[in-house]
UniProtKB/Swiss-Prot annotation:
It comes from the Bacteria. Belongs to the TerC family. Residues 28-43, 111-113, 157-198, 247-261, 308-321 are cytoplasmic. Residues 1-6, 65-89, 135, 220-225, 283-286 are periplasmic. It comes from Salmonella typhimurium (strain LT2 / SGSC1412 / ATCC 700720). This is Putative membrane-bound redox modulator Alx. It is found in: Cell inner membrane.
Length: 322
């Protein structure tokens, strides 16, 4: 697999991730189960975005010094584009988590604990998926067309789908887990397992954690091929992807109280998926430059947020008039 990643770059990335996760887990252990405040969520979100941009700047500087700007510029731009794509698509994942926590009545103080382990699991699973996907593409280049068609289909499906938490309990995964795990009827504080009468029982909190991991895998099937449309370099795909999801937990608590204010966002994400799908399908006829792709994705998100703000304004105006 061709990659710009050197041992120094891989090592630097690993050190940053391990240090930040260690700090996060240490704070979680000291404070115990508690809900992240809006102020804390905003602070952590800003920190993760800043850290991602600083990493990209260091990445660009290293490549510029070792291989020249003709290599550094497009690679740093590819990281930024991949990061923006993953960050925007991750918002839809946040809304699914909201439905899961609401359906299973998980208190805010326990949601953070679930998401800590959820993000750790996502790091492992996505790393495996990215390396497997990169290897498959290098062996079977025609898979890019399959990914493109899949993203096109997914984009249309996302625009037409209706979000409803009432059907979560009937999903095959939930029914299978409930049928095969000895499980308590209620959440037992912050425990995933408890002992009763000498027997080990899973709690509904474990079920929620498994569903959080499962939902992330489903969304990764969309987002990882989307980044492959920008670059197939495993270093850039992995680092941009993981930096985006490392800030996902903070993003969840930032958006959890205002999710209903982003009703138009899924349509913007759908358009992004359709654009990326088309980009992959026409690659043999016309190669869309990375800078153009970044501009299109950023433009779609900006237009979507403007429309969303207008819709919210009209809705609020109607409510005030009643």
């Amino acid at each position: 697999m061709n990659t710009v990643g050197t041992p120094l770059l891989w090592g630097g990335f690993a050190v940053v991730v391990v240090i930040m996760l260690s700090i996060d887990l240490l704070l979680q252990g000291r404070r115990g189960a508690h809900a992240m405040s809006m102020k804390q969520a905003a602070g952590w979100s800003i920190l993760w975005v800043t850290l991602s941009l600083l990493f990209n700047a260091a990445f660009w500087w290293y490549l510029a010094e070792t291989q020249g700007r003709e290599v550094a510029d497009p690679q740093a731009l590819a990281f930024l584009t991949g990061y923006l794509i993953e960050k925007s698509l991750a918002v839809d994942n946040v809304f699914v988590w909201l439905m899961l926590f609401s359906y299973f009545s998980v208190p805010p103080a326990l949601q953070r604990r679930v998401l800590v382990y959820g993000v750790l699991g996502a790091i492992v699973l996505r790393t495996i998926m990215i390396f497997a996907g990169t290897w498959l593409i290098t062996q079977f280049e025609w898979l890019l067309y399959v990914f493109g068609a899949f993203l096109l289909f997914t984009g249309v499906k996302m625009a037409l789908a209706k979000e409803d938490e009432s059907g979560i309990g009937e999903k095959p995964m939930v029914r299978w887990l409930r049928g095969h795990l000895r499980m308590t009827d209620t959440i037992e504080n912050e425990h995933f397992f408890v002992r009763k009468n000498g027997l080990l029982y899973a709690t509904p909190l474990l079920l929620v954690l498994i569903m959080v991991e499962f939902s992330d895998v489903i969304f990764a099937v969309d987002s990882i091929p989307a980044i492959f449309a920008v670059t197939t370099d495993p270093f850039i795909v992995l680092t941009s992807n993981l930096f985006a999801i490392l800030g996902l937990r903070a993003m969840y608590f930032l958006l959890s109280g205002v999710a209903e204010r982003f009703s138009m966002l899924k349509y913007g994400l759908a358009v992004i998926l359709v654009f990326i799908g088309i980009k992959m399908l026409i690659v043999d006829f016309y190669h869309i430059p990375i800078a153009i792709s970044l501009g299109v994705v950023f433009g779609i998100l900006t237009i979507t947020l403007v429309i969303n703000a207008w819709v919210n304004h009209q809705r609020d105006k109607k409510l005030r008039a009643q």
